[in-house]
Curated annotation (Swiss-Prot):
The keyword 4Fe-4S applies. Its cofactor is [4Fe-4S] cluster. [4Fe-4S] cluster binds at residues 95, 129. Binds 1 [4Fe-4S] cluster per dimer. It comes from Heliobacterium modesticaldum (strain ATCC 51547 / Ice1). The lineage of its organism: Bacteria, Bacillati, Bacillota, Clostridia, Eubacteriales. Mg(2+) binds at residue 14. It catalyses: chlorophyllide a + oxidized 2[4Fe-4S]-[ferredoxin] + 2 ADP + 2 phosphate = protochlorophyllide a + reduced 2[4Fe-4S]-[ferredoxin] + 2 ATP + 2 H2O. This is Light-independent protochlorophyllide reductase iron-sulfur ATP-binding protein. Homodimer. Protochlorophyllide reductase is composed of three subunits; BchL, BchN and BchB. PANTHER family: LIGHT-INDEPENDENT PROTOCHLOROPHYLLIDE REDUCTASE IRON-SULFUR ATP-BINDING PROTEIN (PTHR42864:SF2). Belongs to the NifH/BchL/ChlL family. The keyword Amino-acid biosynthesis does not apply. Pathway: Porphyrin-containing compound metabolism; bacteriochlorophyll biosynthesis (light-independent). Keywords: 4Fe-4S, ATP-binding, Bacteriochlorophyll biosynthesis, Chlorophyll biosynthesis, Iron, Iron-sulfur, Magnesium, Metal-binding, Nucleotide-binding, Oxidoreductase, Photosynthesis.
Length: 287
């Protein structure tokens, strides 16, 4: 199973993806996480360090693909999760999306991807360009990470549009659902997921331990082993992992028009306004 995780920059995609990867690995699956961001920090909490990127390795071997072995690219980290970082060109030059596409080609050439039960792409995704949309061409399912605010949901909707476009082009990728992250409330998230007709997979509250885990280089599951009070959040990730491993059908989201996005949360019939007594349909939920 291949899962592509998208979301607005800074929304917590990497933290979410890493904890999902560990939750899945703890069920006995072989898991590979591929970081697709020029920052190259997607897998920091799993590897416990910044690992060499594909770009750096290609440069080391003078771009002789035939000289590269799987062990040059893949690092095994916490809970047996294996990780790869694409890296990217220097700031202000080149195309990071192109690097993502070339990384996938290299992993396929080395027959790396077939060695895992579950592969998670952690993808930069404010506005998905062609290169950063490449994982959608390989993925069975996509997940969108969003906080409960307009800018994050606007980016989420653009990702939904990319999923619709990929299906129109013949690719069979479906949206598994939206993951709420750093959420004190979920009103906007629930309105959005109802509108696009997709599940709200789970909600991770705003929490200091989560922020500290990222800084210290630990997943939440490691903090749990250290006795930190994070069991509520690890339980949420276990629930989401179980949902993904059930291989849900997913949906082609009913993406919202750009202009409608600016009106969606201003309507008088939104549940928290309650001015006209309308009751919105329930958000699809994860079993």
């Amino acid at each position: 199973m291949i899962i592509a995780v998208y979301g607005k920059g800074g929304v917590g995609k990497s933290t979410t993806t890493s904890n999902l990867a560990v939750a899945i690995a703890k069920t006995g699956r072989r898991v590979l996480q591929i970081g697709c961001d020029p920052k190259s920090d997607s897998t920091f909490t799993i590897a416990g360090r910044m690992i060499p990127t594909v770009v750096e390795i290609l440069d080391k071997f003078n771009y002789h693909y035939e000289s590269i072995e799987p062990d040059d690219l893949v690092v095994q980290g916490y809970a047996g999760v294996c990780v790869v970082e694409t890296g990217g060109p220097p700031a202000g030059s080149g195309c990071g999306g192109y690097v993502v596409g070339e990384t996938v080609k290299l992993l396929e050439k080395l027959d790396i991807m077939r060695q895992y039960d579950v592969i998670l792409f952690d993808v930069l995704g404010d506005v998905v360009c062609g290169g950063f949309a490449t994982p959608l061409q390989y993925a069975d399912l996509a997940c969108i990470v969003s906080s409960n605010d307009f800018d994050a949901l606007f980016a989420a909707n653009r990702i939904c549009e990319s999923i619709v476009e990929k299906n129109a082009s013949g690719y069979d990728v479906k949206l598994a659902g939206v993951i709420g992250n750093r959420c004190d409330q979920v009103d906007l998230l629930e309105t959005f997921t109802r509108r696009i007709e997709a599940p709200l997979m789970g909600v991770v509250p705003r929490n200091e331990e989560v922020r500290q885990s990222r800084v210290k280089g630990y997943t939440l599951f490691e903090l749990e082993e250290m006795g930190e009070p994070v069991s509520e959040m690890t339980g949420e990730f276990r629930k989401m992992a179980a949902y993904l491993l059930s291989q849900p059908d997913g949906v082609v989201p009913n993406a919202v028009g750009t202009r409608e996005m600016f009106e969606l949360f201003r309507g008088e019939d939104l549940p928290w306004k309650g001015s006209n007594g309308k009751t919105a349909a329930s958000t699809p939920s994860v079993p």
